[in-house]
């Protein structure tokens, strides 16, 4: 990949990041809440979360990044592999953030703890006009889909796909070795724990978590496949660009394959 092409790739990610920041600041649609449905949003307002936003972002971003550099260190993968993996992971996370935020703003679904965000004293007005802090109330209208769930799966599912490719979990030479399958599933389990914790914190309904998880996993897989072949491919451990520049005299199995 030339300098111009790399610059264009990075530019796309910068624009997506800016779009993410802008959508973070916009107010959501104020969906009308009927008195008979208030029970859905009357769960306690919990400030101590199992996975605070900062911790979730660290996990979602650093897990795939750590695996990329660990693979390079342990298997002596070339710079092209690491660069393509970083581009794929960053694209998945950036696209996920923009799409998740836009859907949140359009839907404007109240969180399970919205009642106590809207009425901190627990006393609802007859016209249901909120008396709570405006920022807290607006954040309470961003339940669907779950951002924690989508980011967790965007980052950790990508890590799973990357591991599966490097370990050949789904090719003939990698099947039948249970530790490889466990390694592939571990990040997905961690992502599920983060996602489900949002229902325990009363920050999301189960539908928010389910759809958010699906969004994150979809972007993780789509972006992974933009740079890497299918996980059933015998050369799934190599990015497309690396395969294109492979000398015809070199056997595919000689590059970046871990035999255990």
Curated annotation (Swiss-Prot):
Active site, UniProt feature:
148, 204
Pfam families registered for this protein in UniProt: PAP2
List the membrane topology term(s).
Multi-pass membrane protein
Which top-rank group of organisms is this from?
Answer: Eukaryota
Provide a GO biological process annotation. Answer: phospholipid dephosphorylation
Expression by tissue, per the entry, reads: Specifically expressed by antibody-secreting immune cells.
Summarize what gene deletion causes: Mice lacking Plpp5 are viable and display no overt physical defect.
Give the region (Phosphatase sequence motif II) as residue ranges: 145-148
Q: Where is this region: Phosphatase sequence motif III?
A: 197-207
**Membrane side Cytoplasmic: residue ranges:** 72-86, 172-175, 224-260
What does UniProt list under activity regulation?
A: Magnesium-independent phospholipid phosphatase. Inhibited by N-ethylmaleimide.
Q: Does the keyword NAD apply?
A: no
**Which residue ranges does the record annotate as region Phosphatase sequence motif I?**
104-112
Q: In which pathway does it act?
A: Lipid metabolism; phospholipid metabolism
- Give me the Extracellular side stretches, as residue ranges: 1-50, 108-150, 197-205
Chain positions of site Stabilizes the active site histidine for nucleophilic attack? 208
**Primary site of residence:** membrane
InterPro entries of this UniProt entry? Answer: P_Acid_Pase_2/haloperoxi_sf, P_Acid_Pase_2/haloperoxidase, PA_PP_rel
What's the protein called, per UniProt? Phospholipid phosphatase 5
Organism for this UniProt entry: Mus musculus
Encoding gene (name)? Plpp5
